[in-house]
């Protein structure tokens, strides 16, 4: 399973510069990666763990068309699953309208708005079960889903805040989803900085989105369903935010 999350199309008021950067990432780096993974494993699938769009109130037409084009291309080569993230919803729960409806008519693409059990097959053999829990807006509801499916699935895919992990600002998350309620491993979107423990993996955004990403190596996770192991491929393509000391900046010449 190829995992991606928090791609946030429409960032910075639908900036054309950001659209171009994101478009290049998908067409020149990510889609070629997907094709390489498919060459190794024809049964591979793609799961996006939420926040395809940035703005929950209004979506720029050019941004929407770009997103549709990209996912039409992806779905033409690999089965795609997309969970609702909080930025994809009109309300702070999963009861409102979803901007992902724009993608609902794409063949080979499944939108996950309600908790769904996914069963994956490789070589005609059932190798893994995943409980997909989209953003529900209430940690208590998400905890109930983890308890309900605790021993029924190998992994939980989510878009949520998880206790004992970190917000992007470094503060510890408290009073949120309790990953210990689930017997398997929890893999989630929502937090943009990558984090890994034995129990939880925040896969993070695939590219830098703001200065809060300074120092965070972005990339793509791939989940091997046979070994149940995650591997990480760094994104060495996209621009990054960085800090430059004032003295060093002042000494830069025009060619730097």
Give short role names for the model-derived ranges:
Residues 6, 50-51, 85-86, 159, ...:
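Active-site glycine-centered loops adjacent to acidic/histidine catalytic or metal-binding residues
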Residues 7, 13-120, 179, 183:
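Core catalytic region of metal-dependent phosphoesterases/phosphodiesterases
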Residues 67, 88-177, 206:
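Conserved catalytic scaffold of divalent metal-dependent phosphoesterases
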Residues 9, 54, 162, 193:
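Short active-site segment of divalent metal-dependent hydrolases/proteases
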Residues 1-2:
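Extreme N-terminal starter segment of soluble prokaryotic enzymes
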Residues 166-229:
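Conserved beta-sheet core of the metallophosphoesterase superfamily
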Residues 118-123, 203-256:
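Binuclear metal-dependent phosphoesterase catalytic core
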